[in-house]
Amino acid sequence: MGTSQAFLVLSCLLTGPSLIVCQLLLPSILPNENEKIVPLSSSFSLRCFGESEVSWQHPMSEEEDPNVEIRTEENNSSLFVTVLEVVNASAAHTGWYTCYYNHTQTEESEIEGRHIYIYVPDPDMAFVPLGMTDSLVIVEEDDSAIIPCLTTDPDTEVTLHNNGRLVPASYDSRQGFNGTFSVGPYICEATVRGRTFKTSEFNVYALKATSELNLEMDTRQTVYKAGETIVVTCAVFNNEVVDLQWTYPGEVRNKGITMLEEIKLPSIKLVYTLTVPKATVKDSGDYECAARQATKEVKEMKTVTISVHEKGFVQIRPTFGHLETVNLHQVREFVVEVQAYPTPRISWLKDNLTLIENLTEITTDVQRSQETRYQSKLKLIRAKEEDSGHYTIIVQNDDDMKSYTFELSTLVPASILELVDDHHGSGGGQTVRCTAEGTPLPNIEWMICKDIKKCNNDTSWTVLASNVSNIITEFHQRGRSTVEGRVSFAKVEETIAVRCLAKNDLGIGNRELKLVAPSLRSELTVAAAVLVLLVIVIVSLIVLVVIWKQKPRYEIRWRVIESISPDGHEYIYVDPMQLPYDSRWEFPRDGLVLGRILGSGAFGKVVEGTAYGLSRSQPVMKVAVKMLKPTARSSEKQALMSELKIMTHLGPHLNIVNLLGACTKSGPIYIITEYCFYGDLVNYLHKNRDSFMSRHPEKPKKDLDIFGLNPADESTRSYVILSFENNGDYVDMKQADTTQYVPMLERKEVSKYSDIQRSLYDRPASYKKKSMLDSEAKNLLSDDDSEGLTLLDLLSFTYQVARGMEFLASKNCVHRDLAARNVLLAQGKIVKICDFGLARDIMHDSNYVSKGSTFLPVKWMAPESIFDNLYTTLSDVWSYGVLLWEIFSLGGTPYPGMMVDSTFYNKIKSGYRMAKPDHATSEVYEIMVQCWNSEPEKRPSFYHLSEIVENLLPGQYKKSYEKIHLDFLKSDHPAVARMRVDSDNAYIGVTYKNEEDKLKEWEGGLDEQRLSADSGYIIPLPDIDPVPEEEDLGKRNRHSSQTSEESAIETGSSSSTFIKREDETIEDIDMMDDIGIDSSDLVEDSFL
């Protein structure tokens, strides 16, 4: 640049660019005009002069148009000249032509130079042809824009339209329409010589842009290993017109891969990602992203430094030394600073053993402070002596490993571990041994007090010197922190006190010991031995008392309850001992012969017996006799007497084991009940299972797991239990084995048991679709085993149990242990409900679970009985449902495979119920489900259960059953005959034409009795007024009649009202009573 040129530049800087002189800095164009019109198809040239090399910018490049030529001319002056020549000019050559200095132009700056605008009018082309990108007009929101529809003739009038609507806007033929336009398509129109010309659509698109770029740079990490992939992202928010450039070490190698992702929700976000795969150490350095807004000249950049290592590394820096101490019970923390990549694994060891993380006294913790920096802490909480040792921290990853070990000592105050009189010499000498511990190791000193009475005063103690005659002191170290000292006295003539003192920097420990002269020691030894013996005796007595109290006691399951609230929801147990016992039930012991044992338990047994004189029609009758073992306690005798009184209170019924008599005087208590020929229902079902399966082949034979049997070995099955000392089951009365008899009086007459005649009936309603032969119904309520066990037999058992429980409910009696093992089967397949707990070893029976001092049949109990100890008739209904499951699984154990534990209790609470057994119909299973309702009020009563099951049986079954029941009540069965005297008095003053009228009256009372138990809760009991012993028989009969009447009126029950036979006289009744002994004494005092 010459001197004149430099002067011009300086003048422009001082005076401003508006001066004419500054224009000299730009090149010159000839012709020197702002615009020029060139005829179509003509040629024109433009000449550019400048101080340095110059170039041209024009509407069409030389590559696109061969009609354009640019050349450089040489001249004698110092100026540079470039000529642009166009031949055969067309409308496409219309536009700006600019000459500029080459050295003033950069890629990012706009062209600065001299301009001239050339028009080439074309009558066939009013508008300059558009380029590929000219039809898209991008503008920032709410900013002005230019729609570049340019004309080839400056005098052409142009209009702008948007969807057919004229848009007012200012127009410049060299620029186009300028204004603020809404988004959408626009078309320019022009009319030349009567012809209308239209441009193609210009689409205006508004972009969102702000004055700030809001640039954010992020990288997942700043430290990498060789071979890993570097990923860096830059995000721009709320801007759509952004130009972003990356600068990074690998840029020159074009190693990076860039991507752009646009996210529009919830706000506009442009995410630029740079990925450098397989990084090397050369890729370490600064990574920069620079964003520039295309429309507002706003620029922002972010930088992050990334380091790439050949491999991973680990560095540790502990904040403590190799030897550390901690005071006893002190809280101490040891911190190690770690720098590592990749992420390290940190572990602590104590004496080469890994510390468990969940220790409460020693804890370890790792916290990440920065990308590659970590802090690991070892914390001792209330340090203990055993915390001393060598601690090691190990930090490692796949490429490197570092460790650091330090020794920790717990400083412990001195204390005395042991002070004993260790040795007695033959001449009266004694040695005292003192063991002390502490860290640092303590020193031991000895002190002596010769006046025992003044040893409480420290001034009476003197330090024992090591050089005293007849006294020897010595010390030995035992371990790191334990020391032992000994002092020996040649002779001790009187009692003295010796004190051992242990001292270290943290504290002092001391203990004292008395040395007794040998003459006094023997006296103390004798006193100590007597005291120890006394303590042993007292402890033994306490243990025996506890064991005796925890021993299970016999408890009768049947309970009579009485309501204490109007709705029956609250009740109390009636004390059975308050119930009266009528001496008419007394039976002479010499009229009873005892035989084989039928069942035996922890508290008593049931034996087979023969009774003489119980019934006029059967002078000799086979009976079952309940009795206690000889070792029974008074509480168990009282429980058996309570059972007797409850049975007398209940009265007779076909489907309970009826009381026949009792022996309560001059010996052990015997309760005489009916003899049940077939034993308990469980064993009966087991025994007849094969016959049932043969009649019902459609029922699959399963693996019998619920019976505990082995199906593969049929020869090992035993459905009849012959031994009762172990499980207490009732024996099969048909079993002909040799048993041990307990004779009291030998009689040779043959026992005869009255047989209840069976009845025929129709088939059940629920089986109407099946054809039932008469032979299939013959074995119901009969002993005919030719047909085997049938499904109708199971329904018959179900019905009879419901009727028996209905009777107990009418008497306010709660069974509490209703199960198939407590249901017996008599001749005629008559079901008898009983309480067989006396003759069952419940302590070894898996069906009973220990609860305190009693055993409970949990699997048969209702939830309110298990969890709330609440027993009502409705809880018996639940047990009845479990009994049905036993019957229709042919004697299976409820909840097969489930143990009675917390899981079992939780399942019952959550509503778990057993599935339908194999041999139950859907109607029968529906009964079970109703019985197992978790809400007691929604369970059916036994009255309704009887009706439901009755509908499943043949139509004539109920009539046959009622006839058998009525025949039973009309018979001279001992249970009926002994109650008839009271019931006959209820008919005093009432005249009947015949026995049938009386039966009809009784049947009406029976229906009332069944309805009285239908409430599902508790019927109020009449007041019990025991009969005075001195009243005669007639007075007692009148009282019993009144009581029965009151009970019938108040409870709606006529269970105690029976039929007086027409041929029966008072003399007959008296003769029956004469069989017993004197009734003046009701029971021995020892049982009350």
Swiss-Prot record:
It is found in: Cell membrane; Cell projection, Cilium; Golgi apparatus. It is an enzyme of class 2 (transferase). GO terms for molecular function: ATP binding; phosphatidylinositol 3-kinase binding; phospholipase C activator activity; platelet-derived growth factor alpha-receptor activity; platelet-derived growth factor binding; platelet-derived growth factor receptor binding; protein homodimerization activity; protein kinase activity. Present in an inactive conformation in the absence of bound ligand. Binding of PDGFA and/or PDGFB leads to dimerization and activation by autophosphorylation on tyrosine residues. Inhibited by imatinib, nilotinib and sorafenib. Ubiquitinated, leading to its internalization and degradation. Autophosphorylated on tyrosine residues upon ligand binding. Autophosphorylation occurs in trans, i.e. one subunit of the dimeric receptor phosphorylates tyrosine residues on the other subunit. Phosphorylation at Tyr-730 and Tyr-741 is important for interaction with PIK3R1. Phosphorylation at Tyr-719 and Tyr-753 is important for interaction with PTPN11. Phosphorylation at Tyr-761 is important for interaction with CRK. Phosphorylation at Tyr-571 and Tyr-573 is important for interaction with SRC and SRC family members. Disulfide bonds join C48-C99, C149-C188, C234-C289, C434-C500. Residues 1064-1088 have a biased composition (Acidic residues). One of its GO terms (cellular component) is Golgi apparatus. Residues 24-527 are extracellular. It catalyses: L-tyrosyl-[protein] + ATP = O-phospho-L-tyrosyl-[protein] + ADP + H(+). The active site is at D817. Glycans are attached at N75, N102, N178, N352, N358, N457, N467. PROSITE patterns: IG_LIKE, PROTEIN_KINASE_ATP, PROTEIN_KINASE_DOM, PROTEIN_KINASE_TYR, RECEPTOR_TYR_KIN_III. Keywords: ATP-binding, Cell membrane, Cell projection, Chemotaxis, Developmental protein, Disulfide bond, Glycoprotein, Golgi apparatus, Immunoglobulin domain, Kinase, Membrane, Nucleotide-binding, Phosphoprotein, Proto-oncogene, Receptor, Repeat, Signal, Transferase, Transmembrane, Transmembrane helix, Tyrosine-protein kinase, Ubl conjugation. Residues 1-23 form the signal peptide. The keyword Ribonucleoprotein does not apply. Residues 1017-1088 are annotated as: Disordered. The chain crosses the membrane at residues 528-548. The modification Phosphotyrosine is found at Y571, Y573, Y719, Y730, Y741, Y753, Y761, Y767, Y848, Y987, Y1017. Interacts with homodimeric PDGFA, PDGFB and PDGFC, and with heterodimers formed by PDGFA and PDGFB. Monomer in the absence of bound ligand. Interaction with dimeric PDGFA, PDGFB and/or PDGFC leads to receptor dimerization, where both PDGFRA homodimers and heterodimers with PDGFRB are observed. Interacts (tyrosine phosphorylated) with SHB (via SH2 domain). Interacts (tyrosine phosphorylated) with SHF (via SH2 domain). Interacts (tyrosine phosphorylated) with SRC (via SH2 domain). Interacts (tyrosine phosphorylated) with PIK3R1. Interacts (tyrosine phosphorylated) with PLCG1 (via SH2 domain). This is Platelet-derived growth factor receptor alpha. It comes from Rattus norvegicus (Rat).
